[in-house]
UniProtKB/Swiss-Prot annotation:
The chain crosses the membrane at residues 1-21, 37-57, 77-99, 109-123, 133-153, 180-200, 215-235, 252-272, 279-299, 304-324, 334-354. It is a multi-pass membrane protein. This is Transmembrane protein EpsG. Coiled coil: none annotated. Induction: Repressed by SinR. It comes from the Bacteria. GO terms for biological process: polysaccharide biosynthetic process. May be involved in the production of the exopolysaccharide (EPS) component of the extracellular matrix during biofilm formation. EPS is responsible for the adhesion of chains of cells into bundles. Required for biofilm maintenance. Its main location: membrane. It is found in: Cell membrane. GO terms for cellular component: plasma membrane. It comes from Bacillus subtilis (strain 168). Keywords: Cell membrane, Exopolysaccharide synthesis, Membrane, Transmembrane, Transmembrane helix.
Amino acid sequence: MIVYAVNMGIVFIWSWFAKMCGGRDDSLATGYRPNKLLIWIPLASLVLVSGLRYRVGTDFQTYTLLYELAGDYQNVWQIFGFGTAKTATDPGFTALLWLMNFITEDPQIMYFTVAVVTYSFIMKTLADYGRPFELSVFLFLGTFHYYASFNGIRQYMVAAVLFWAIRYIISGNWKRYFLIVLVSSLFHSSALIMIPVYFIVRRKAWSPAIFGLSALFLGMTFLYQKFISVFVVVLENSSYSHYEKWLMTNTNGMNVIKIAVLVLPLFLAFCYKERLRSLWPQIDIVVNLCLLGFLFGLLATKDVIFARFNIYFGLYQMILVPYFVRIFDEKSNALIYIAIVVCYFLYSYLLMPVDSSVLPYRTIFSR
């Protein structure tokens, strides 16, 4: 626990210094750019804690095995299915691991490399869209996404790239966004969900179409058994067909506290939608992305597998939530800032012993 506490302190304090030593930049949505040099310090802390971990995280052994199996391929063409009966699952990621095997057979290089890529894209995005910057970075840990990224590392890496690509949703550059999604799908095929998402989130927040989509998800949640029988047919011939039986019989779902954390920012965003739009007209896109995260969270109360989709949407809370410290008078904003830090710290503290197997923390130096 002490490692995580020190890491959080370093990340928060040095992100604050980066903000204080930054300067005005009207090319950014925030109008302010943190100090580019100082950003490297919190980034380094995030990478080191994640990249040097050993047997930490629910999926650690699974990814270690994937790394070893990737080294068994004879060439990259075999990974992508040229001249073989079947393409490797998520061939882009498998090819990356295959290349790493030429450097070392130690899978720790995989964890370190993925940490560098994932957190670099997230920090870059928060530097462009997060204000106050240090609060956005703190929320990466406070919302538990940082610790959850120790599991499902390839999906979090893809989610980080698509998080960075929000600039193309905002600008309406669908060609670049779709290209990034297609390349990302080679690393995790679920990234393809972001193609229809592009068209959904560019609508005005709280519009009839968005309310209609929300009603659809509510219906799927309440009529879950009927919905899941259709969903299983979709999975039947995919690389995820092994989930069929598990989906039909599993009753383990996302807990109510996580749902509350997803819905509260949306409630505030609805109540103060005009104030938010006055600060940044494109905030509707971020609100819609957060809403999709909540809707998938509702489905995840029936089966936790749907929480995997929330990986793509939960990151946008790091952009939305800090806006709430800018919509009231100065004194109220300061109180809200403190409340956000305290509440999200307690949230991550309570989750840590029971979620994602991040405790106890061990490093490669203890193996």
